[in-house]
């Protein structure tokens, strides 16, 4: 939990305290923007690839070609974050190596498996729009997001906006 201006506010501490009282650890951090960008980078790399493989990260990233694509998407995501003033650091390959050890199914894959509406716009469409607005090429992510969107549409779990 954090404030957009990077401060540790009493408000954030109070909200965190209430959440923690319910049993969920809730750290208050200074650089919430970096944390949000890091989360988005995880979503754009793992979500589409796991939708396409219909499997968790460990199985998906075991294939060298898919692993290489994930690294490229992570690098594209880092470039997008930098374009918006947030340096999430480098080390896309290291992040993907860590992800490749976890048998985690991203929530968007869980939605597909359970027949629930999928968050295509928030997790895929908006980052692509932001990339276009910032002039950041994301060809690998554009491909994986397009295929994942088609999979969601074909499953009846996403309806692209009209227009």
Segments and roles (model prediction):
Residues 59, 68-163:
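NAD(P)-dependent Rossmann-like dehydrogenase/reductase catalytic/cofactor-binding core
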């Amino acid at each position: 939990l954090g404030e957009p201006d990077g401060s540790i506010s009493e408000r954030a501490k109070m909200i965190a305290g209430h959440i923690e009282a319910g049993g969920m650890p809730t750290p208050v951090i200074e650089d919430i923007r970096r944390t949000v960008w890091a989360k988005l980078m995880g979503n754009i790399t793992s979500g589409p690839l796991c939708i396409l493989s219909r499997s968790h990260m460990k199985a998906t990233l075991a294939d060298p070609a898919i692993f290489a694509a994930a690294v490229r998407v992570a690098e594209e995501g880092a470039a997008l974050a930098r374009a918006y003033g947030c340096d999430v650091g480098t080390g896309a390959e290291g992040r993907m190596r860590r992800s490749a050890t976890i048998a985690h199914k991203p929530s968007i894959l869980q939605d597909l498996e359970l027949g629930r509406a999928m968050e295509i716009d928030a997790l895929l469409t908006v980052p692509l729009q932001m990339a276009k607005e910032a002039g950041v090429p994301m060809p690998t992510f554009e491909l994986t997001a397009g295929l994942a969107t088609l999979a969601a549409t074909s499953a009846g779990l996403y309806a692209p906006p009209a227009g």
